[in-house]
């Protein structure tokens, strides 16, 4: 089954050309099944790029996915047109007012990691979102800053500034090969990393959380928070092949301090075309997450937050 998207959303045409199974909303309505409802709280400046990246990954599932785009209520996007936001997004306040529930929620990163969490203009509303997930979302996936924000809110785990930006493709170790989220993963995992902050392994462990993937160079990468039905990934499996290149070129052109991304360009030559060596693991991770949603979410969506099941038992 495909991912259900409005046929006017830019991601619809992009993913159709890539061979991803997408279906317009009127076609999906003809199928007599309950789709998995997944929300995307998009905190990134380039909304369309981010929508497409995550729709690509969750849309590779054989299950029908209904993707809902959500934004913060009082934060206006400076990099995406108001027309796009008005047509395709709802504010969190609007979603909350309906009382609706979701099988999954993705909370993206945001380029604000230099700020203390409490200084972020929408922090108070994000706290409401995170608390709301405990009654209205079956499983939440926090990405990069979004994952750090959840770990901080639920467990007081601090983010720590790095002396230099962790930037490039770093090798990680699969530390939990029996985890259902790592089904099909190799022992050695390459992940794109782009951040000025880190969370530390000892603080993750002290909070009772499980590190599933980690690196000696850049620390924990994928963490499971079973008590809050959440995963936190601090790196960027969703990145396109040239996302790190775009970030490098942007900073280099602006004269900002930036190193050539590690283990990304062939021969570390920024004039060479980068190769995508993380795509298969990206699809595995998000496909496994969607599979776990299907196996454990209540069939009656109104039971989310009240009950769960497991079709394997």
From Swiss-Prot:
Catalysed reactions listed for this entry: L-homoserine + acetyl-CoA = O-acetyl-L-homoserine + CoA
Pathway(s) where this gene product acts: Amino-acid biosynthesis; L-methionine biosynthesis via de novo pathway; O-acetyl-L-homoserine from L-homoserine: step 1/1
Endpoints of the signal sequence: none
Compartment list: Cytoplasm
Pfam families: HTS (PF04204)
Record EC number: 2.3.1.31
GO molecular function, one term: homoserine O-succinyltransferase activity
One Gene Ontology cellular component: cytoplasm
Residues annotated to bind substrate: 165, 194, 250
Alphabetical list of SUPFAM superfamilies matching this protein: Class I glutamine amidotransferase-like
Site positions for Important for acyl-CoA specificity: 113
Record keywords, A-Z: Acyltransferase, Amino-acid biosynthesis, Cytoplasm, Methionine biosynthesis, Transferase
Residues the UniProt record annotates as site (Important for substrate specificity): 194
GO biological process, one term: L-methionine biosynthetic process from homoserine via O-succinyl-L-homoserine and cystathionine
Active site: 144, 236, 238
Predominant cellular place of this UniProt entry's protein: cytoplasm
Described purpose of this protein according to its UniProt entry: Transfers an acetyl group from acetyl-CoA to L-homoserine, forming acetyl-L-homoserine.
HAMAP family according to UniProt: MetA_acyltransf (MF_00295)
Family indicated by similarity: Belongs to the MetA family.
Name of this chain's protein: Homoserine O-acetyltransferase
Protein species of origin: Jannaschia sp. (strain CCS1)
């Amino acid at each position: 089954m495909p991912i259900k998207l409005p046929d006017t959303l830019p991601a619809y045409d992009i993913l159709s050309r890539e061979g991803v199974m997408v279906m317009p909303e009127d076609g999906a309505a003809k199928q007599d099944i309950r789709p998995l409802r997944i929300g995307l709280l998009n905190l990134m400046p380039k909304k369309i790029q981010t929508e497409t990246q995550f729709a690509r990954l969750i849309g590779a599932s054989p299950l029908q996915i209904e993707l809902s785009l959500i934004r913060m209520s009082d934060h206006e996007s400076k990099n995406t047109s108001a027309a796009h936001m008005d047509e395709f997004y709802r504010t969190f306040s609007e979603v909350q007012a309906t009382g609706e529930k979701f099988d999954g929620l993705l909370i993206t990163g945001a380029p604000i990691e230099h700020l203390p969490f409490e200084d972020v203009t929408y922090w108070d509303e994000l706290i409401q979102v995170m608390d709301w997930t405990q009654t209205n979302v079956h499983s939440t996936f926090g990405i990069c800053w979004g994952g750090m924000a959840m770990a901080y809110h639920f467990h007081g785990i601090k983010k720590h500034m790095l002396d230099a930006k962790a930037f490039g493709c770093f090798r990680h170790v699969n530390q939990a090969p029996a985890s259902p989220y790592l089904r099909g993963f190799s022992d050695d995992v390459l992940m794109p990393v782009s951040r000025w902050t880190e969370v530390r392994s000892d603080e993750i462990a002290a909070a009772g959380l499980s590190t599933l993937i980690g690196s000696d160079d850049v620390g924990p990468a994928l963490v499971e928070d079973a008590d809050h039905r959440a995963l936190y990934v601090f790196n960027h499996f969703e990145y396109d092949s040239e996302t790190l290149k775009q970030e490098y070129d942007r900073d280099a052109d602006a004269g900002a301090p930036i190193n050539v991304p590690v283990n990304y360009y062939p021969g570390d030559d920024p004039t060479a075309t980068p190769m995508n060596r993380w795509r298969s693991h990206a699809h595995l991770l998000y496909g496994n997450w969607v599979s776990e949603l299907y196996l454990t979410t209540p069939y009656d969506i109104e039971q989310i937050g009240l009950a769960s099941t497991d079709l394997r038992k």
